[in-house]
């Protein structure tokens, strides 16, 4: 695939039967043994993902915390060292520039993990808003590889090849300088599947060795490599949002039900705060809802949502859920049609299929916090 970027793991995909596609300008595996098999493997055992296409940036300096707070909707002040926070970075209108993870290493040292498709845009946005803040900003994406081991057996498997007690790394906490198969890594208890799991950040030259070491450690437990197809169905069932589907620069966090991550009462100003305060006071005019198709069919991204002959929104993500065995989806619709139990139609290939609004938390699994 000419002109596409590759991750440090590009050479190992074919060893495991990987089928390669263009994703966010990268050659990445969409599946290995089939996305249904891979989906169930993560729900029941554990799966290993190459997520080295994600972007990373370091923000350091005396004003690092203040600067991060100015960029983000969540309350950065609550973060202690070695903790992780999910947040949005918005424009002045409250539209989402990106959703990302903020890792706090120290008062003057923060690590940002950003979506692959937004890497260049995000780094430019951050640099453009530096102003008089005493900070240094560095795009470190090319010097880091990232693996994700996800599933109920993730801890058991990874514990075999690390030098720390993984039970000490709680949900949304991190540990630096963990030896994973003898290689220094950053390990956080985070993920994008709705399961327990870890994200492992390493040097690019260590990625292949760690990939093999983790899969070998999980052989008995049935660990498998997982592609992008299952990554999307897993995050979707857990109602984890995808930039470009559920969010973009014209959609606010409040419209997609993510107000918990928008702290309007923080003392400090942040970009988009005024617009979001106004939107909260006036009420949103559209909302993200879950739905189930009553008629037979599969909803897909972009399909129209119709009520009484009028288009009231669109499907943001839709699948036949591998776990629930139902055709379900997420849709951004006019607020008055967002109540659970509301019936509407989804236009699937020129046919209008009946659907009903349901709780968008399709799948929940208790994350280990012990």
From Swiss-Prot:
Keywords in alphabetical order, please. Answer: Aminotransferase, Transferase
Q: Which GO terms describe its molecular function?
A: aminomethyltransferase activity; transaminase activity
UniProt cross-references to Pfam families, sorted A to Z: GCV_T (PF01571), GCV_T_C (PF08669)
Enzyme Commission identifier(s): 2.1.2.10
Q: Which GO cellular component terms are attached?
A: cytosol; glycine cleavage complex
Q: Which InterPro entries match?
A: GCS_T (IPR006223), GCS_T_bac (IPR022903), GCST_C (IPR013977), GCV_T_N (IPR006222), GcvT/YgfZ/DmdA (IPR028896), GcvT/YgfZ_C (IPR029043), TrmE/GcvT_dom1 (IPR027266)
| Top EC class of this enzyme | transferase
Catalytic activity, per the record?
A: N(6)-[(R)-S(8)-aminomethyldihydrolipoyl]-L-lysyl-[protein] + (6S)-5,6,7,8-tetrahydrofolate = N(6)-[(R)-dihydrolipoyl]-L-lysyl-[protein] + (6R)-5,10-methylene-5,6,7,8-tetrahydrofolate + NH4(+)
**SUPFAM superfamilies per UniProt:** Aminomethyltransferase beta-barrel domain, Folate-binding domain
One GO biological process this protein is involved in is: glycine decarboxylation via glycine cleavage system
Keyword Cell division in the entry? The reply is no
Q: Does the keyword Transferase apply?
A: yes
Give the signal peptide range.
none
The record's comment on protein family reads: Belongs to the GcvT family.
Function according to Swiss-Prot or TrEMBL: The glycine cleavage system catalyzes the degradation of glycine.
Q: How does it assemble?
A: The glycine cleavage system is composed of four proteins: P, T, L and H.
> Which NCBIfam families would you find in this protein's record?
gcvT, PRK00389.1
The protein's name is Aminomethyltransferase
Q: Which organism is it from?
A: Clostridium botulinum (strain Loch Maree / Type A3)
């Amino acid at each position: 695939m000419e002109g596409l970027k590759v991750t440090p793991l590009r050479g190992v995909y074919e060893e495991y039967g990987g089928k390669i596609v263009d994703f966010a300008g990268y050659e990445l595996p969409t599946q290995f043994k089939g996305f249904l098999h891979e989906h169930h493997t993560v729900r029941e055992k554990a799966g290993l993902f190459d997520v080295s296409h994600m972007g990373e940036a370091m923000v350091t300096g005396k004003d690092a915390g203040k600067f991060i707070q100015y960029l983000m909707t969540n309350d950065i002040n609550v973060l202690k060292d070695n903790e992780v926070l999910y947040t949005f970075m918005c424009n002045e209108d409250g539209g989402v520039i990106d959703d990302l993870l903020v890792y706090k290493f120290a008062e003057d040292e923060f690590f940002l993990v950003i979506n692959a498709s937004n890497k260049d845009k995000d780094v430019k946005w951050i640099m453009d808003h530096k102003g008089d803040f005493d900070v240094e900003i560095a795009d470190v994406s090319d010097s880091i590889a990232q693996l994700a081991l996800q599933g109920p057996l993730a801890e058991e498997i990874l514990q075999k090849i690390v030098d720390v007690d993984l039970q000490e790394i709680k949900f949304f906490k991190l540990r630096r300088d963990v030896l994973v198969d003898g290689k220094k890594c950053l390990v956080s208890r985070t993920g994008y599947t709705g399961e327990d799991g870890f994200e492992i950040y390493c040097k690019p030259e260590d990625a292949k060795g760690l990939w093999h070491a983790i899969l070998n450690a999980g052989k008995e437990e049935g660990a498998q490599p997982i592609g992008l197809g299952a990554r999307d169905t897993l995050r979707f069932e857990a109602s984890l949002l995808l930039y470009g589907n559920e969010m973009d620069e014209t959609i606010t966090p409040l419209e997609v039900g993510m107000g918990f991550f928008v702290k309007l009462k923080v003392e400090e100003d942040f970009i988009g705060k005024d617009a979001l305060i106004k939107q909260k006071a006036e009420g949103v005019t559209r909302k993200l809802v879950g739905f189930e198709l009553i008629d037979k069919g599969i909803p897909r991204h972009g399909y129209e949502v119709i009520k009484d002959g009028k288009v009231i929104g669109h499907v943001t993500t839709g699948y036949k859920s591998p776990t629930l065995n139902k055709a379900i989806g997420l849709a951004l619709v006019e607020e008055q049609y967002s109540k659970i139990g509301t019936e509407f139609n989804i236009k699937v290939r020129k046919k209008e299929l009946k659907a009903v609004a349901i709780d968008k938390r399709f799948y929940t699994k208790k994350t280990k916090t012990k």
